[in-house]
Amino acid sequence: MADVARARILYLHGFCSSPASWKARLLGERLATAGFADRFSCPTLPPVPLAAIACAENLLACAEGPTTLVGSSLGGYYATWLAERHDLRAVLINPAVMAPVLLGGLVGTHSNFHTGETFEFTAEHVAQLRALETPGVTPARYLLLVDSGDEVLDYRQALERYAGSRQIILEGGDHSFPRFPEFVPQIIEFCGL
């Protein structure tokens, strides 16, 4: 188990999302209530994939203790790449296993769900996602949480991709993973806090 005095959580939000996502806010609030507010980070990830990775890597480089990643949707895709590259653990919530394929169909103008800020998602960004594909994963690194009713992603891709990892599969639900509050204690425990 990680040293509780130093363990940290880095939350990576999904496409068109932000630190204002309800899951990020709830996790941050629960950690603050437990006295760990200073151990939680959720940056605003740029819509450009390589810039998002650079942002996360900068935070990892500054971390004073072991960091566990928590990634939702596209954030789960990023968390996988970072976990394998930097020997970290990660909690994945309805991860975008096939992000280049999924987002390849979304080239164009988008608005952030929380800020309303618009941005262009381009074919170059899809190529950057392809460059972040991770050929294999180390199952022991991961806690996977998926909803079978995810309307955006096929949850079975995640089950296959992270076979052998600790998996929580819920019937129904949707891409937002509405039962997230029930699993916050397990997430915090997995993260070593």
Briefly describe each language-model feature range.
Residues 3-4, 61-65, 137-138, 191-193:
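Glycine-rich phosphate-binding loop signature in dinucleotide/nucleotide-binding domains
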Residues 5-65:
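Active-site catalytic motif of lipid deacylating hydrolases and related acyltransferases
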Residues 70-79:
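Gly/Ala-rich beta-loop-alpha elbow adjacent to hydrolase catalytic centers
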Residues 82-86:
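Aromatic pocket-lining residues of Rossmann-like dinucleotide-binding sites
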Residues 65-68, 141-143:
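Short active-site oxyanion
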Residues 88-193:
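The alpha/beta-hydrolase serine catalytic core
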Residues 61, 65-67, 88, 93:
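Internal catalytic or translocation cores that form aromatic/hydrophobic pockets or channels
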